[in-house]
A protein has these predicted regions:
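Structural core segment of the AMP-binding/adenylate-forming
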Residues: 210, 214-305
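N-terminal chloroplast transit peptides
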Residues: 1-26
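Conserved pre-ATP/AMP-binding loop-to-beta segment of ANL
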Residues: 151-153, 275-286, 294-329, 336, ...
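Conserved AMP-binding/adenylation subdomain of ANL enzymes
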Residues: 346-366, 376-405
């Protein structure tokens, strides 16, 4: 497969595919970016006599390559056996799978792990169980192997420009997420409060999601491509008193004025009276600079400064298995957006289980998913799934088509 893109994302995906691990691979965390890989490809082509790509022309696409999916089910018969087990006794099946998670208090053995009716909508998982999803995604891996697990890379990020990259170990994630957790608390956020997150795909987005989970707040991520009207309607519907955003987002050569959109959204419906604090990650502008392209008000807080003042550890909140973890709104394409509530125990197990069974993700693997955190795929397969299983999640800002040469 000849590669024409210029990003670490593309390089990672090519490496994944050539290793027959669709979106999951065990490669060093400092894997070379695509500019280096392109040189390697060119040298290989020259040695083999195969012509190199014509660099004088733009290439809009690469040749399609289809690979069979990988699964922990090594045969169809083993899959059918597992499926039959889940159908024959769902409660026993999920009770066994719940051992994937670390519980502060084990679910009650006096009640079924799964009870209720999907038809009636009163389904509940793991009664009596107590846990924290952030602890399961970060702390337990950092503490593993006598604390050496904290040296493993938890997240790799590539910015809009391929040269803008960062890595975070599990120890660094624990410290940063704890500081954000304490920053949220300093603004009055408490267990059960809804925090609306309207951010680009920068490291602080999944970190803020995890921070909400850590303190028991309910995160409501709104896709950063939505309008002020769409954002305002979701803030109002969820009764969210807190908003976390960034000054701008980058998408290729475009700058998206996120803070300006938030300011506009707060004039919609009852948002002006509802929202108590807007926390802003400032990436490019000083709030006091004369050329700052947005307005800061008395309720706005400069998040970078606030986070820097916080202690590097926050005790995780003990959550009931049925406590709300997050709300995610439907797109609204078939009517008014509907806020779908995902609860702690059931969702955490779902994210861990499906990431394992579908992608065979193991510790040491790097997992890349091109979804945005504004959608459920991004929640599960960019943030929670890989981290719950102790892998490395790869996230990128902007679009996979940029830069396209």
């Amino acid at each position: 497969m000849r590669l024409h893109g210029q990003s670490l994302l593309a390089a990672l995906l090519v490496n994944c595919l050539t290793n027959s691990h669709a979106f999951s691979t065990s490669v060093p965390s400092n894997f070379a970016n695509t500019r280096q890989l392109s040189k390697l490809n060119s040298a290989t082509e020259e040695a083999s006599g195969e012509p190199s790509p014509d660099n004088s022309k733009d290439h809009d696409h690469a040749e399609s390559v289809v690979y069979d999916p990988i699964s922990t089910n090594t045969s169809f018969s083993s899959y059918k056996s597992k499926y039959a087990e889940s159908i024959a006794d769902p409660s026993a099946f999920w009770a066994k799978e719940a051992n994937r998670l670390t519980w502060f208090q084990e679910p009650s053995k006096d009640h079924p792990a799964l009870h209720g009716s999907f038809l009636k909508g009163d389904v509940k998982f793991f009664p009596g169980g107590k846990l924290n999803v952030c602890y399961n995604a970060i702390d337990r891996h950092a503490l593993a192997n006598g604390g050496k697990g904290g040296e493993d890379v938890a997240m790799i990020w590539e910015g809009d420009e391929p040269t803008d990259t960062k890595e975070f170990t599990y120890n660094e994630m624990l410290e940063k997420v704890s500081q954000i957790s304490n920053a949220l608390k300093s603004q009055g956020v408490k267990k059960g409060d809804v925090v609306t997150i309207y951010m680009p795909m920068i490291p602080e987005l999944p970190m803020t999601m995890l921070a909400c989970a850590r303190i028991g707040a309910v995160h409501s991520v709104v896709f950063a491509g939505f309008s002020a009207d769409a954002l305002g309607s979701r803030i109002s519907a969820s009764k969210s008193k807190y908003v976390v955003t960034a000054d701008i987002g980058l998408r290729g050569t475009k700058k998206i004025p996120l803070k300006t959109i938030v300011n506009d959204a707060l004039t919609k419906m009852d948002c002006e009276k509802l929202v108590e604090s807007v926390m802003v990650y400032e990436r490019f502008y000083d709030k006091d600079a004369e050329d700052a392209p947005y307005e800061m008000t008395d309720r706005d807080v400069r998040m970078d400064q606030l986070v820097g003042l916080q202690r590097p550890y926050c005790v995780p909140e003990v959550m009931d298995a049925e406590d709300e973890l997050f709300i995610l709104y439907t797109s609204g394409s078939t009517g008014m957006p509907k806020g779908l509530v995902h609860t702690t125990g059931g969702y955490a197990l779902y994210a861990s289980f499906t990431t394992d069974v579908t992608f065979n993700l193991k510790k040491g693997d790097i997992f890349a998913c091109v979804a945005d955190c504004g959608w459920i795929t991004g929640h599960t397969y960019v943030v929670y799934g890989a981290l719950l299983n102790g892998g490395t999640t790869f996230i990128f800002e902007s679009t996979p088509m940029y830069p396209g040469k």
